[in-house]
């Protein structure tokens, strides 16, 4: 019952296992319901997000497809309008080409007609459909005629909004492209929107797709009669059509409809995918129904568990509780047999074992009680023995107090200076007897020590007198040594200053030698560079001679080739002369043909024509021959000038070779002189370097002497300081000896208050010991 006081549960629950089980089952049911509700909410939210993403992605996919379709149509109409037949052909050729486009299926899907359109008169001049030829498009209400588009250039195109005309019974979208080179002509693709509307609306079961423009009018709708009408979404207060950017997509929902919207990149159209809200979220309702069924099933199962297992468990616990209370009241013969093999069977067995253990413990407790009574009797006897021993201890304590007083008196006498006092060591207690012997031994040792100290004090007084006398003699000698060392230090200092002055002079001499060596080295380097430059110049001159010789040879070959060309031109001139002669003969033949034609009257018309042709060709040939002859003469004249120039160049090259050869000879002479100068400068450089090294060696020797002199001065200064320190130390020793004698006198007067035996003999021994030390 005490454990229930700390339980957070009310007492009526904490005191009943059935109540606890009921509370636990109720809590489990609440947890299951809460988990089911949370799962349902999360599943519904996830499903709604998936549905929104799915519808929006579908609208984006269809927008991309529609974009591609429009781009293809624009590109196709633009390329068709550039065909030569539409820029340069006749109306008949254009009509024939348009019919071929349709019959050969060269048009994009959905194009029902192609028109060659006059933008000024709004007349269709040619068409792939014979019914449209000569039709005034403006009278039919076609927007590309009533409101003609303004093109930025020949590559521009225009897509109209859906429209209907009386000639056809379905909505049309026109794609218009200007004809290059003709501002008043355009090519128009007429596209049937029904097929495209059916294509984009057949992608998903349970949904349909529409296309609206930014004005809110349907461009495409599964119900073709709705094309051109106003879309309901544009009439809402929060119209999303005007807020969409090209390529942007969004999700919109109403009470009954879900919509995914995507605006096209290439045109102001918006693709809208519609899906019924109830059908789209049907899966969410199914999930919620399934979760409710699972929750009810779990609740029923928990109830069955509580009724079956819980009821049986409670009955078993109550029976076991009654038997446990009987055992607690001392009734250990209760029946603990059970046929259960589960945890309750184990618990019955545990209670049976506990009952056996209780019986054993009761038997052991009775045995322990008997043993305690026997121990009590033994304790009484022990107490009597202790009383007898206490009397004996009191007698021993009195004896010990007496001996302690005797020992104390002897120690007090020793403390007062009487070291001859001793104690009696016989005692009832062995330890006290040993203490007495130790006291006597200590007093003997202390008496001997005091005697030795008296003798030692006398010896110290005598030794202090001798030390004082010797210290005075050593002090006089130290002062003399210090004076001599100071004189040595002054001489060494003067010698060091002289060596430093010599070292400075040698330093200047060494620097001058090094500067001369450096200058000589620079001159040597310059001389070597000059020699190398001269050698390079000589090699370059040799190469120049070789190149100029090669140029001279090539010039000779060029002159020979030009002369050969001149000979070839002479031969060509002879051929031109032959051609000129042939032309003159041809002119004669043409003249004869003309005469024959004149004699032949009407029958000679053919001869006259041939004669005129031959004459014309002859004149042209003669002019060409004269031109060739003039060009040959010009080339021959230019070749002659070139030959003269090449010969003059060859002469100059020969003279240049001679000049370069003279330059080579001069460079060789310069190189020889430079090498001789370089040799002399190298010798000067080596001598200067040797002089610099000698100066450095002398400098090193002087530095060594300076160092030795400085060390000597330093050592002399150190020795002088040591002598002064020694003198001071001697004075301190003398003072210490005086102080030591005073303290020895004080010690001797202090030791006189102690009374000892045979002090003379001990003092002699101590004196001898001190003398040995």
From Swiss-Prot:
Name what induces it.
Answer: Expressed constitutively throughout the growth phases, both in presence and absence of white light.
Q: Where is this region: Disordered?
A: 717-740
**Compartments reported by the entry:** Membrane
Q: What is its main location?
A: membrane
Query: Keywords for this entry?
Result: Coiled coil, Membrane, Repeat, Transducer, Transmembrane, Transmembrane helix
Q: Which domain of life is it from?
A: Archaea
**Alphabetical list of Gene3D superfamilies matching this protein:** 6.10.250.1910, Methyl-accepting chemotaxis protein
Which residue intervals define the domain Methyl-accepting transducer in the entry? Answer: 470-706
Q: What does the record say about its membrane topology?
A: Multi-pass membrane protein
Q: Which residues form the HAMP domain?
A: 311-363, 398-451
Coiled coil (residue ranges): 727-760
For bias type Polar residues, the affected ranges are 724-737
GO molecular function annotation: transmembrane signaling receptor activity
A GO biological process of this protein is: chemotaxis
UniProt xrefs under InterPro entries = Chemotax_Me-accpt_rcpt, HAMP_dom, MCPsignal_dom
The UniProt record lists the keyword Transmembrane helix: yes
Which residue ranges does UniProt annotate as crossing the membrane? Answer: 21-41, 291-311
For the keyword Repeat, the answer is yes
Q: Name one GO cellular component term.
A: membrane
Q: What does this protein do?
A: Transduces signals from the phototaxis receptor sensory rhodopsin II (Sop2).
User: Belongs to which family?
Assistant: Belongs to the methyl-accepting chemotaxis (MCP) protein family.
Q: What is this protein called?
A: Sensory rhodopsin II transducer
Q: Which organism is it from?
A: Haloarcula marismortui (strain ATCC 43049 / DSM 3752 / JCM 8966 / VKM B-1809)
